[in-house]
Structures are given as structure tokens and as C-alpha cells.
Amino acid sequence: MKVSAALLCLLLMAATFSPQGLAQPDSVSIPITCCFNVINRKIPIQRLESYTRITNIQCPKEAVIFKTKRGKEVCADPKERWVRDSMKHLDQIFQNLKP
């Protein structure tokens, strides 16, 4: 009986101090959103609700994700004139909404 209790105690200690038991993530894992393809046609400004810039170095392309009023997300090239104009327009709308 003493042997099995000692063995159980030893196994619990080994499990507690094993490298997997002590492993801690270096940072919180945050999902990364990347755009691999961009739309090649203009989206009318009145259909757009918001945008997010994608500048993560882990993504293959710099991009802008537009969210439409219907909830669809579309990737666009920030170098395109219509994309920059749309971003500026949305910025002005949000600026006017602030008190």
C-alpha cells in the first residue's frame, strides 16, 4: 500500500513539473486576418459601412477590408484611387458623428 501511494505521489509530481505542464505561451495568440486577393472593381461608397487597414507583416499583401452595409467583407488594394477616396469619405462620416 505504501509503495503504491509513493508511486502515485511520484507520478503526480512528474506530471506537474514536466515541460508540458510548465509550458506557458509567450504571448496571447490573436487570429490574424490577411487578404490574399483584392477586388478589382469599385464598390459604390453608399454601400460601404466601415473599413480596416491590414498592415500586419505576416500578411503577404497590404490591404483594406471594407465592410458593406449588408455585412460582407471585401479586400481592396490601398493603392487604388477609389479605395483611398472611399476611406477618406468614411473617415469624414465618422468624424462628423463624433460629439
From Swiss-Prot:
UniProt keyword list: Chemotaxis, Cytokine, Disulfide bond, Heparin-binding, Inflammatory response, Pyrrolidone carboxylic acid, Secreted, Signal
PROSITE patterns, per the entry: SMALL_CYTOKINES_CC (PS00472)
Leader peptide range in chain numbering: 1-23
Source organism, top-level taxon: Eukaryota
Subcellular location field: Secreted
Function: Chemotactic factor that attracts monocytes, lymphocytes, basophils and eosinophils. May play a role in neoplasia and inflammatory host responses. This protein can bind heparin. The processed form MCP-2(6-76) does not show monocyte chemotactic activity, but inhibits the chemotactic effect most predominantly of CCL7, and also of CCL2 and CCL5 and CCL8.
Subunit structure: Monomer or homodimer; in equilibrium.
Name of the featured protein: C-C motif chemokine 8
Organism, scientific name: Homo sapiens
Organism ancestry: Eukaryota, Metazoa, Chordata, Craniata, Vertebrata
